[in-house]
């Protein structure tokens, strides 16, 4: 489990330290007023430039429980009044990073809320795109309310002492087939696997090359520099597969998805001691055309036994999705589906600005008819 002090400062320490091997990103400090906005009920978005403050079409009052009356819409206030400097800083940062970014709070990205985005992805072009994802995400809500539930020291932490930041990364399109999740225990890379749970046949022919590239990256960049000895990290290894990029870092905790492993496996995996791993491995070298044995070797049975007893170098376990894996048939299920709303709501969100409003009206009508039917049934009884 992560240490509280390390967990608090992860985002502050890791971004500048690993800038050379991560996608371009910026940190935006978040004041208490903005955190209160994220925790508040309902999804009220600030007005776009030139617009009047109003309810977002993506919300239409559904999530706040408000009625869709014109009076309520007109009375809606700009929620960014108390954190206008932060709003403007986010606008500037988006522009600085090329107009498209992917957001993340200290420890979690709102990946479970991408269904709310018009692109069905983490790509955000405006501050309101970011706010919509953050306020719709169970992952972000957990970070705000239960950030330290899975730390080694679960003592209470004053929210005012937690330096919350919004991490905005320049949006780049990644090939999901060469994204990998890596698991570090006691500063040892013990396992890695695909992040995208689909079968990619070409990965098997280059499994050793990919593992060596990630192992070398970890030894050089992370092993002795990351503040916590136990953590997971995600990497991207694009063609020609010799350059490794650090995409994300996550806590060694149950809420981090182990993907092709289980947490019990990772916690109990047999790993050799560092001293044992660093012992000299004897290699037998042979010249072309020779048997690789000297006269002394041929006369010494003890030496023959030693040559047969060559130690193997331990390597982290690397799991890929196999074509015939029976569990792979379930991989087509959308990620984070447990965090999403019913299909009717999702479909409505894809119909443009009026889709959610129309669905809200249909929902209210269905509720009214159901209530009317219950009343009639009660009178009949």
From Swiss-Prot:
Keyword Hydrolase on entry: no
Superkingdom to which the source organism belongs: Eukaryota
Region (Disordered): 48-79, 279-309
Keywords linked to the UniProt accession: Cell cycle, Cell division, Cytoplasm
Entry's Gene Ontology BP terms: cell division; eukaryotic translation initiation factor 2 complex assembly
Molecular function per GO: ATP binding; magnesium ion binding; protein folding chaperone
InterPro entries: CDC123
GO cellular component: cytoplasm
Family: Belongs to the CDC123 family.
Protein name: Cell division cycle protein 123
């Amino acid at each position: 489990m992560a240490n509280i002090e390390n967990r608090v400062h992860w985002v502050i320490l890791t971004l500048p330290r690993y800038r050379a091997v991560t996608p371009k990103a910026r940190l935006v400090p978040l004041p208490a007023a903005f955190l209160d906005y994220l925790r508040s009920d309902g999804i009220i978005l600030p007005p776009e430039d030139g617009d009047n403050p109003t309810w977002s079409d993506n919300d239409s009052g559904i999530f706040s429980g408000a009625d869709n009356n014109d009076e309520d819409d007109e009375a809606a206030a700009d929620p960014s009044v108390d954190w206008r400097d932060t709003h403007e800083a986010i606008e500037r940062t988006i522009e600085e990073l090329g107009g498209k970014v992917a957001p993340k709070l200290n420890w979690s990205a709102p990946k479970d809320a991408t269904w709310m985005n018009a692109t069905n992805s983490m790509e955000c072009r405006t501050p309101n795109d970011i706010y919509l994802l953050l306020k719709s995400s169970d992952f972000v809500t957990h970070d705000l309310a239960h950030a330290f539930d899975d730390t080694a020291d679960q003592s209470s932490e004053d929210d005012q002492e937690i330096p919350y930041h919004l991490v905005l990364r320049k949006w780049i399109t990644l090939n999901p087939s060469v994204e990998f999740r890596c698991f570090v225990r006691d500063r040892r890379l013990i396992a890695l696997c695909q992040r995208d749970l689909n079968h990619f046949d070409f990965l098997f022919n280059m499994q050793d090359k990919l593992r060596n590239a990630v192992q070398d990256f970890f030894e050089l960049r992370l092993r002795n520099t990351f503040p916590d000895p136990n953590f997971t990290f995600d990497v991207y290894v694009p063609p020609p597969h010799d350059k490794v990029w650090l995409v994300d870092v996550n806590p060694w905790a149950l809420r981090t998805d182990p993907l092709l492993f289980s947490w019990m496996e990772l916690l109990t995996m047999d790993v050799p001691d560092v001293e044992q791993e660093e012992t000299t491995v004897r290699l037998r070298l042979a010249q072309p055309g020779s048997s690789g044995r000297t006269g002394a070797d041929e006369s010494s049975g003890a030496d023959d036994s030693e040559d047969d007893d060559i130690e193997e170098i331990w390597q982290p376990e690397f799991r890929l999705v196999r074509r015939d894996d029976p569990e792979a048939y379930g991989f087509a299920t959308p990620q984070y589906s447990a965090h999403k709303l019913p299909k009717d709501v999702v479909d409505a969100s894809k119909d443009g600005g009026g889709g959610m409003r129309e669905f809200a009206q249909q929902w209210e009508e269905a509720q009214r008819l159901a209530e009317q039917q219950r009343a009639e049934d009660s009178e009949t009884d």
